[in-house]
Amino acid sequence: MNIDYVKSILPHRYPFLLVDGVIEESEDRIVAFKNISISDPVFQGHFPEYPIYPGVLIVEGLAQTAGILLLKSVEGIPLFLGIDEARFKKEVRPGDRLIYEVRKLGEKLGTVQVEGVAKVDDKIVAKARLLLGVKKK
């Protein structure tokens, strides 16, 4: 599923829409991707001589992927409420295809906890547990 599908679900837009498409999804799991390009605005400052995609944007991409999963069953605006156990293992560089794998762990009091893993070439580059909610429209 392409960018049009993503834009039909998420409220985010360029330059802060960090998911390019969805590879697969089920009720409690989703796999999405972002193609990292040297033309991404972040590389004007992070770092021009040795561009590295920022870890915080990888985590935001995981959160947006989780938002797609949430908004399939609830209407509203996805809110990123918290992060635990974030780890960054490898650099992500222009030309990489970042794969986001997000799995729902549980729901409690209007919040959803997910586990996210980001990969490049089937190697883990980052992982985190995220807490999300949905603001009703």
Curated annotation (Swiss-Prot):
CDD domains: FabZ. It comes from Thermotoga maritima (strain ATCC 43589 / DSM 3109 / JCM 10099 / NBRC 100826 / MSB8). Pfam families: FabA. The active site is at H46. Belongs to the thioester dehydratase family. FabZ subfamily. Its EC number is 4.2.1.59. This is 3-hydroxyacyl-[acyl-carrier-protein] dehydratase FabZ. Keywords: Cytoplasm, Lipid A biosynthesis, Lipid biosynthesis, Lipid metabolism, Lyase. It comes from the Bacteria. It catalyses: a (3R)-hydroxyacyl-[ACP] = a (2E)-enoyl-[ACP] + H2O. GO terms for cellular component: cytoplasm; membrane. Transmembrane segments: none annotated. InterPro entries: FabA_FabZ (IPR013114), FabZ (IPR010084), HotDog_dom_sf (IPR029069). GO terms for biological process: fatty acid biosynthetic process; lipid A biosynthetic process. GO terms for molecular function: (3R)-hydroxyacyl-[acyl-carrier-protein] dehydratase activity. It is found in: Cytoplasm. Involved in unsaturated fatty acids biosynthesis. Catalyzes the dehydration of short chain beta-hydroxyacyl-ACPs and long chain saturated and unsaturated beta-hydroxyacyl-ACPs. SUPFAM superfamilies: Thioesterase/thiol ester dehydrase-isomerase. NCBIfam families: fabZ (TIGR01750), PRK00006.1 (NF000582).
